[in-house]
Amino acid sequence: MSKTPNKILVIRMSALGDVAMVIPVLYPICRSYPEKEFTLITSPLAAQLYIDCPQNLTVKAIDTKKEYKGIGGIFTLFRELKKEKFDAVADLHDVLRSKMLSLLFRFRATRVATIDKGRKEKREITSEQRHSFRQLKTSFQRYADVFDKLGLQTSQKFSPLAAPAILPDWLQRSKNDTTKWIGVAPFSKHTGKNYPLDKMRNVVCELAKTGQYKVFIFGSPADGEVLDKWQDQEGNIISLCNCKLGFKTEMALMTQLEVVISMDSANMHIATLMGTPVISIWGATHPYTGFLGWGLNEESVIERKDLTCRPCSVFGNKPCRFGDYRCMEISPEEVIARVKDKIEGRTK
């Protein structure tokens, strides 16, 4: 049996949710091998998620749209990385860029382990003519399998990340505030994963108007025009879209929330990293493909189990073949009831 490597390069560039899913696997591995050095290369945006890091983990932000753009950028990156004298590469991405980097390291006789994404299984489970419907390996297990190929295992359990920042004064809970704080992240990258905005607005407004809840809405400045109008409807709605809080402050805020309502999205994963309960709404995609957040189960998911057409997509990027996204015909009342049940279950 070959000895375990001492200096490991870990590659996972994107997407944000997938990079977030690396943390519950990589952190325990790093802490189980304090004598070894780990370096993760990822996108500048995703690098901001890596807080409360193990001391032997270095996170390098690699901008593939600027200095590391294209084929030339891959060679530039390799020339820089080879100076670090890594003795193993864990490719958690398996796309053209990571394949090329891995190949260049192989030419230098560096040991490489690559993720099996289960692409064939995922195509089968989302096919109209699927012959089986079962839980596939989670991304967490697929990441762990890569480290296992390098002889790196751990029995350590992942613990939620420590709050990375102090909240600004206007986000501090006052002594007289007895409301339950709820987060809402109403967007994901693809239409097939987005709960209709009119329905989500009903959810947010109905919760806020009870006076029992304060609702914080997460989104980008591009979402502000829509979400700021929600804020104007009820006093207990706070839109964070134009606040420029940054990931660290948003992650710190999540630790103060009773629950986060999300899509199958990066915010689902970020909330679970902070140990915050989640209610996640799934449409075209399905937890069986392996992307459910850390520690979540079917009780955290709202979905249309009666539809045989779903999942029709692994990532939610395929247009609905019926044109109506019937998978998102989920009533606001059902979402509200599940949120209240989650909060009551927490406070009992």
Protein language model regions, located:
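Catalytic machinery of carbohydrate-active enzymes
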Residues: 1-348
